[in-house]
Swiss-Prot record:
HAMAP family, per database record: Maf
Enzyme class: hydrolase
Protein name in the entry: dTTP/UTP pyrophosphatase
Organism superkingdom: Bacteria
Organism: Myxococcus xanthus (strain DK1622)
Amino acid sequence: MNADQTLLVLASASPRRRELLAQLDIRFTVSAADIDETPHAGEAAEAYVGRLAREKAHVVASRHPGAWVLAADTTVALGAELLGKPRDAEEAQAMLTRLSGRTHDVYTGVALAGRHEETLVVRTRVTFRALSSGEMSWYANSGEPLDKAGAYAIQGKGGFLVAGVEGSTSNVVGLPLGETVALLERAGLPLPWRAS
């Protein structure tokens, strides 16, 4: 597909990122990148999500010459510990137990490749309520946490876990919209609100 047909390619399989980007009425297609998402030893959360977003963007840009390629990656950090996606309900409950009653950071790396190269990382601080074992067990077994960094979806059932958010809520969902729009504007992407 050439750049005239598709100006922006979203390098993500995440339905949440697709939904967030679609809210902006920006025309795009999706082409997921399959990369190794294992953190490097001692890699900080900011460096980790920035690296993964860049790698995803470059893999997909090689398949779509001439297009802008947008990629993102999100992780939850509790101190230096990175909390990715739980493998099962038991691991989800263990993550929720660690997050209960505490403040953690959600980092999303956003990278643009192809016509414009730039990477940014956005941090949002999220505080969980003190959760009962029953709440954690119910939520962990609901199925919702299994494909979510940190084992929760703030935009879904998991919203009841949260006592407060400092920063971008869309960042916690997987794509910080304000920062992403600013990035696309800097790149010169034709956006719906710009005069033709």
